[in-house]
Amino acid sequence: MGYNKLTSLSANIKAIETAVAIHSQGRTATQEEKQVLAQYSGFGGIKDVLDLGTDKPLDKGVAGLLNRLLDALRTLAGGDEAACRSLVESIKSSVLTAFYTPQFLIDAVAAQIHKTFSANGLQMQSFLEPSAGIGGFLPVAMPGTRSYAFEKDTITGLVLSLLHEDATTVTAGFETIGT
């Protein structure tokens, strides 16, 4: 099955709406909510979001979805227009910088890491995912490992923190580590 931007956009918006609800209620995500959050794939390649917050007419095929997205961002921003604009800009900048890592690649890397650690009698004590997205590589960490995740995009960072509450999540670029 090929990539369908409308399906991806719809899943992203549903995940964001779910994340906003969880965040506003100040609680952790249920397993069912985590399944919804896990469908979030970011906005890499979904250029339609570049029209968010502009006077440009929205494409009829995505107008309803983009309006839902804007509503969710306004809710997350708590009515603060500057905060909402910042969230919109964060999403727009991710169009060119967000990348999806397929599960088969994550599985291959995980298998090699575990094989190398086992073969050499090593024990993982901490695990860093420097450009986390929604934390696809975090499950690579072995039991008892402290996990740290950096994610630059604000919305993706929120989804990440709700999916992996056991990891220390930093919503900032990896280049800020130690500052």
Label each residue range with its predicted role.
Residues 1-179:
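Class I S-adenosyl-L-methionine-dependent methyltransferase catalytic core
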